[in-house]
């Protein structure tokens, strides 16, 4: 890096952005370290060799180092001021916006996408009208049922502001962070286009129409599954991609082939450039034609971050060819980072940006170093080293953003990548030919179909192998930083030293350290699942319990909230999944998690659970996925070292035909902590427990029936006198949970109250014998 000014400038810009965002001293220390490295490198290679007699030569020798140091400092300051300017610009209008506010927006239509039967319209160069104020703002997103407007036209739109929601549990999709990284701060609901004026962007609209037509050719000539994959792979059209197929590619570790990136640009762009050079076109003519085609292709595929990076690097390569200079990948990568981040500094927190740049760094910095050291004789060996380098560079980030890594991905890529060029070439050729002749296109798509069938077979085989996916949990960012610093030091040492075998073990140890993120000690997490229940308990002995898990107002709560939470925590399996009763708001997520083939050893019911349709469905799912069924009677206990989880209700004397009334009630207790889990019992069952002296004081109380006014009775709470009470309910739910009477009774008992709809996930840990509560949404 210290021999590449563009990389130094990019590093300065990145550190400046990070310093302004977090304002931490260690970021300034890293910048100072890089600056010292630049100065030391220049002193070692340039300045110390200056002649004392030749003053002119000395002056020239000092000018270049001064320029390099000045550039680094300038870009460091540019990063600080650029991010500060963007933040001030955003806050100027965001501070005035609220959910549900009626506003009018004027902006230029810059992009359109068809998704789920609706057209997503993206406006840039926007002006926002709030009352009497008109403020410039970032991009706006809204949806239309028909595609009546053209790219480039200016639209005046009225609608209701919907601000993006932050994730409310660990591991959940954070819409606010995702869209803010793309400079889209809110969307308009119930949007009405009031006026349209201005000329369309003829080229942009034609490119969009061409994309839609080629996608239509795929739909006409291929199966739905093949269409989804090929449209995503060649056009960036993700709306047709089947969710199951996408997940299969991710688990197999080949989802990168679905993103328009350097692989696509090299196949198409370099293929065309070499063809033009072969037919004796000049460097300039070949470069202009290839560059124009790749620029147009980038626009047609949606100009994602990885696409922009690949296109910019390709342009640098073409420019180098034209002026007769060798191409340096790291310098091109540094220039790409500068251009992208000067346009949008928030992309520094976008997974696609980080993974794209990490993959190229893996190839160039790690892969080329390994190749120089090992000097492989065969292309196979060289490809293996490059693939290993990419994995080494990207796996920590994969673990950070997705909480699991595909174990066999390096092996699978050996089968997938050699024929990807054929698939892309025939797929695009067939798409264009299909505009003229669907029959000829169908012939070209036959090999594409069989390649995709082969990919599917390979993916399914890899997923079926033992330990196909390793749930890593989300590593701390400090671990990631340490990993990359040590990786750089190891590569430097491998270049300088002859004995290198030990460094391989260091690299493997580092990777394992990053990927090992177990839950430690006692922890209780009350998840935000909307109107429902879901709690995770990790004991000191390492046993994993989960209580209920469902929702009536959050769609696919198991898929999008509960399972990502468990993976982010690094929980590889649940030992005992407790089901209080079989209402949908307690089991809908559990069913999804079983269907996702996540490992659950046991599902635990009350001995007196009602034998209804929901219960039978759960039994069938458990049998299908190899989960054992256990039933607890009053007095039964799970022992776990010094801890115990005891069933205190229902017993054989309590009769009812109501699911809620027969909820399984459990008391957990260890040396420091005690808690009671109540399901959806009502005040009648609570009174029964008090009268039969089955309850006593506890540290933690899960409010019965989501804080219902018909539960959480005064006598029951006085008997429990909990230190901490949590209420799991959805925002603006139709049941009025939590009830005012319940809240009054809880507070009267002396308990602190925490609601998931306000706090997000609520975590309880023990420190020095006292419970400590952490709220996920605190400070967000």
Mark where each language-model region is.
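Hydrophobic alpha-helical transmembrane segments in multi-pass membrane proteins
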Residues: 4, 8, 20, 47, ...
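Membrane-anchoring/interfacial helices and their immediately flanking loops
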Residues: 1-10, 402, 416-421, 434
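Membrane-interface helix/helix-cap signal primarily in integral membrane proteins
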Residues: 56, 62, 72-256, 560-564, ...
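Residue-level signal for inorganic ion chemistry
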Residues: 16, 107, 352, 394, ...
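N-terminal leader/targeting segments
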Residues: 1-93, 309, 357, 480, ...
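Non-globular, low-confidence helical/coil segments that flank catalytic cores
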Residues: 126-133, 143-160, 171, 178-179, ...
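Hydrophobic alpha-helical segments of integral membrane proteins
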Residues: 203-222, 229, 237, 245, ...
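Aromatic-rich juxtamembrane segments at the membrane interface
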Residues: 2, 11, 181-313, 318, ...
């Amino acid at each position: 890096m210290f021999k590449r000014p563009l990389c130094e400038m990019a590093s300065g810009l990145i550190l400046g952005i990070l310093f302004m965002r977090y304002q931490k001293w260690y970021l300034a220390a890293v910048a100072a370290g890089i600056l010292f490295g630049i100065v030391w490198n220049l002193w070692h290679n340039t300045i110390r060799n200056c002649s004392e007699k030749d003053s002119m030569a000395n002056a020239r020798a000092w000018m270049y180092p001064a320029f390099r140091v000045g550039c680094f400092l300038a870009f460091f300051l540019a990063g600080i001021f650029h991010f500060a300017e963007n933040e001030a610009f955003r806050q100027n209008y965001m501070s005035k916006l609220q959910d549900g506010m009626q506003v009018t927006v004027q902006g230029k239509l810059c992009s359109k996408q068809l998704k789920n039967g609706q057209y997503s319209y993206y406006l840039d160069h926007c002006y926002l009208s709030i009352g009497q104020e008109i403020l410039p703002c970032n991009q706006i997103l809204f949806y239309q049922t028909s595609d009546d407007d053209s790219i480039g036209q200016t639209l005046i739109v009225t609608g209701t502001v919907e601000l993006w929601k932050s994730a409310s549990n660990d591991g959940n999709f954070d819409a606010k962070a995702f869209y803010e990284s793309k400079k889209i701060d809110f969307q308009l609901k119930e949007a009405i286009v009031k006026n349209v004026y201005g000329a369309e962007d003829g080229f942009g609209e034609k490119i969009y129409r061409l994309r839609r037509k080629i996608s239509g050719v795929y739909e006409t000539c291929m199966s739905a599954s093949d269409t989804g994959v090929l449209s995503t792979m060649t056009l960036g059209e993700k709306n047709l991609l089947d969710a199951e197929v996408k997940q299969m590619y991710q688990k197999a570790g080949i989802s990168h082939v679905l993103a328009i990136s350097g692989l696509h640009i090299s196949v198409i762009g370099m293929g065309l450039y070499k063809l033009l050079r072969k037919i004796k076109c000049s460097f300039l003519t070949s470069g202009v034609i290839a560059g124009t085609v790749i620029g147009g292709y980038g626009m047609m595929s949606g100009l994602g971050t990885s696409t922009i990076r690949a296109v910019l690097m390709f342009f640098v390569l073409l420019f180098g060819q034209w002026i007769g200079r060798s191409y340096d990948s790291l310098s091109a990568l540094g220039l790409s980072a500068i251009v992208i981040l000067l346009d949008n500094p928030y992309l520094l927190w976008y997974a696609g940006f980080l993974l794209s740049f990490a993959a190229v760094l893996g190839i160039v910095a790690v892969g080329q170093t390994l190749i120089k050291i090992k000097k492989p004789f065969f292309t196979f060996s060289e490809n293996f080293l490059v693939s290993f380098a990419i994995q080494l560079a990207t796996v920590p980030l994969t673990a950070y953003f997705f909480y699991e890594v595909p174990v066999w991905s390096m092996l699978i890529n050996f089968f997938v990548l050699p024929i990807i060029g054929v698939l892309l070439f025939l797929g695009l050729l067939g798409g264009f030919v299909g505009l003229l002749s669907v029959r000829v296109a169908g012939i070209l798509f036959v090999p594409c179909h069989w390649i995709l069938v082969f990919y599917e077979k390979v993916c399914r085989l890899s997923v079926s192998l033992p330990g196909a996916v390793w749930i890593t949990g989300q590593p701390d960012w400090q671990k990631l930083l340490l990993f990359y610093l040590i990786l750089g030091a190891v590569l430097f040492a491998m270049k300088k030293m002859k004995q290198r075998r030990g460094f391989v073990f260091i690299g493997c140890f580092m990777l394992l350290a990053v990927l090992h993120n177990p839950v430690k000690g006692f922890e209780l997490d009350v998840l935000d699942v909307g109107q429902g229940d879901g709690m995770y308990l990790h004991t000191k002995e390492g046993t994993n319990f989960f209580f209920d898990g469902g929702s009536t107002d959050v769609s696919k709560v198991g898929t999008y909230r509960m399972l990502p939470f468990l993976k982010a925590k690094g929980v590889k399996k649940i030992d005992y999944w407790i089901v209080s009763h079989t209402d949908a708001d307690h089991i809908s997520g559990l069913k999804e998690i079983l269907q996702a083939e996540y490992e659950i050893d046991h599902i635990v019911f009350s001995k007196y659970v009602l034998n209804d349709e929901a219960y039978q469905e759960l039994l069938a799912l458990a049998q299908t996925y190899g989960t054992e069924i256990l039933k607890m009677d009053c007095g039964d206990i799970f022992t776990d070292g010094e801890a115990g989880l005891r069933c205190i209700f229902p017993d054989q004397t309590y009769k009812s035909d109501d699911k809620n009334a027969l909820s399984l009630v459990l008391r957990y207790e260890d040396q420091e902590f005690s808690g009671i889990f109540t399901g959806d019992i009502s005040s009648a069952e609570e009174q029964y427990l008090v009268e039969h002296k089955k309850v006593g004081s506890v540290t933690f109380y899960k409010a019965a029936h989501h804080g219902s006014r018909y539960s959480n009775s005064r006598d029951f709470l006085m008997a429990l006198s909990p230190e901490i009470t949590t209420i799991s309910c959805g925002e603006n739910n139709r049941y009025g949970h939590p009830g005012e009477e319940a809240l009054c009774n809880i507070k009267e008992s002396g308990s602190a109250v925490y609601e998931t709809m306000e706090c997000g996930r609520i975590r309880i840990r023990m420190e020095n014998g006292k419970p400590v509560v952490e709220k996920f949404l605190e400070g967000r």
